[in-house]
């Protein structure tokens, strides 16, 4: 008669044996004959001895081969890979190490070895007039023993200084903005504007053109300080550059002044005629002795 798993009878020896707490001394006895080599502790990432080499596989195991093959040294590296290697944190050579320099030609990277530019000998170079005038000054200064006389192209205002007019105060009260004076130099055109102090927040700008108002530009003026009795007026300064091609005889610059305050806009355009400057010849005379001791060579 067969018995199921629940009816299995254990030996009496196992049933009468009591299990006590397991002692770990037996494990220590097993390792007692093996002397462990002490290991030195060091923080991770610190320099030290290299790890021991991996033991070679046994004769039964097949020899392992790397999946990724190393690139041949004769192959040129791509520009992207070379840039990444140059920008890597560890790419810089440390002191005392030797770094070999390699030369690569443009054709190895798919580029052209030469760049050809064709010039037509019949085309005359376009030299600005102000450059030619300065070259003529230097040649006259070196080859002549007489006094130096030359002409320069410069912008000259077509109007007298408004601040010197007798009705300047009346115009200022009527327009709330009025141009004081304007000056020209190699750096461009600059000037001052006076406005009535209507409110604290205000803005002054100069709108100018080199093409007869076909295209316009604006230069924002900066506050310089108060003026007038008890600070009822303010003075602003402005400036804008002049391109070299404009320094030709007859070329003109037109501009007007705009004043924005308290949500309103006011203009000073020289009584609807605009302020203008014209490029004209300006004659200069300088004795020979003063030329040799001056900075005329650097004009």
Curated annotation (Swiss-Prot):
Disulfide bonds: none annotated. Residues 169-278 form the CBM21 domain. Residues 57-67, 85-94 have a biased composition (Low complexity). The keyword Phosphoprotein applies. Keywords: Carbohydrate metabolism, Glycogen metabolism, Phosphoprotein. The modification Phosphoserine is found at residues 23, 25, 28, 74, 133. Residues 1-22, 37-94 are annotated as: Disordered. The CBM21 domain is known to be involved in the localization to glycogen and is characteristic of some regulatory subunit of phosphatase complexes. One of its GO terms (cellular component) is protein phosphatase type 1 complex. Interacts with PPP1CC catalytic subunit of PP1, and associates with glycogen. Interacts with EPM2A; in the presence of NHLC1/malin the interaction leads to PPP1R3D ubiquitination and autophagic degradation. This is Protein phosphatase 1 regulatory subunit 3D. GO terms for molecular function: glycogen binding; protein phosphatase 1 binding; protein serine/threonine phosphatase activity. Gene3D superfamilies: Carbohydrate binding type-21 domain (2.60.40.2440). A motif (PP1-binding motif) lies at residues 101-104. Expressed in all tissues tested. High expression in skeletal muscle and heart. One of its GO terms (biological process) is regulation of glycogen catabolic process. It comes from the Eukaryota. Seems to act as a glycogen-targeting subunit for PP1. PP1 is essential for cell division, and participates in the regulation of glycogen metabolism, muscle contractility and protein synthesis. Residues 44-56 have a biased composition (Pro residues).
């Amino acid at each position: 008669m067969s018995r199921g798993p629940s009816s299995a009878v254990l030996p009496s020896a196992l049933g009468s044996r009591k299990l006590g707490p397991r002692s770990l001394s037996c494990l220590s006895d097993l390792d007692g004959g093996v002397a462990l080599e002490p290991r030195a502790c060091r923080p991770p990432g610190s320099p030290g001895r290299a790890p021991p080499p991996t033991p070679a596989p046994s004769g039964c195991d097949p020899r392992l081969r790397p999946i990724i093959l190393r690139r041949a040294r004769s192959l040129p590296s791509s520009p992207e890979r070379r840039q990444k290697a140059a920008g890597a944190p560890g790419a810089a050579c440390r002191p005392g190490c030797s770094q070999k320099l390699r030369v690569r030609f443009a054709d190895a990277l798919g580029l052209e070895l030469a760049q050809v530019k064709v010039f037509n000998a019949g085309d005359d170079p376009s030299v600005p007039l102000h450059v030619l005038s300065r070259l003529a000054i230097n040649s006259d200064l070196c080859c002549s023993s007489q006094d130096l006389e030359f002409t320069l192209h410069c912008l000259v205002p077509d109007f007298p200084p408004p601040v010197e007019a007798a009705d300047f105060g009346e115009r200022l009260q009527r327009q709330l903005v009025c141009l004081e004076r304007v000056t020209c130099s190699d750096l461009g055109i600059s000037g001052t504007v006076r406005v009535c102090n209507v409110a604290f927040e205000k803005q002054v700008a100069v709108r100018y053109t080199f093409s007869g108002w076909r295209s316009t530009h604006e230069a924002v003026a900066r506050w310089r300080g108060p003026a007038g009795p008890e600070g009822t007026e303010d003075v602003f300064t402005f400036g804008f550059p002049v391109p070299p091609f404009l320094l030709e005889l007859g070329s003109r610059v037109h501009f007007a002044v705009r004043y924005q305050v308290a949500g309103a806009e006011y203009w000073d355009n020289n009584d609807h005629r605009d302020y203008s400057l014209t490029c004209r010849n300006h004659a200069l005379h300088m004795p020979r002795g003063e030329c040799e001791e001056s900075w005329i060579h650097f004009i």
